[in-house]
UniProtKB/Swiss-Prot annotation:
Highest taxon above the source species: Viruses
UniProt-recorded name of the protein: Gene 86 protein
Species this chain originates from: Mycobacterium phage D29
Amino acid sequence: MANNYRYVEAVRDAEGFIIDGDYAAWDCSRCGHEAQRYRGQSDVDCRNCGACYNASGQRLRDDWRGNPSAWDDEVGDLEGFELQHSDY
């Protein structure tokens, strides 16, 4: 789970528009920088190192982007995993 999970309250101007804040934040478990999730977002990535998190701050696997089954309908999940890791 996320370390130091917190909610940053919205700062509004005189007309009621949000000018800052209104997001959840936590410390990235990989690099220690702040990861932010704004209202309406689902999965987010750390802007510093690219570590993936779900909406509640749980760290997700971030090697899925290299799996061809994520974008190629002709490649199955297991076949894509094998292709992704074939150079090890």
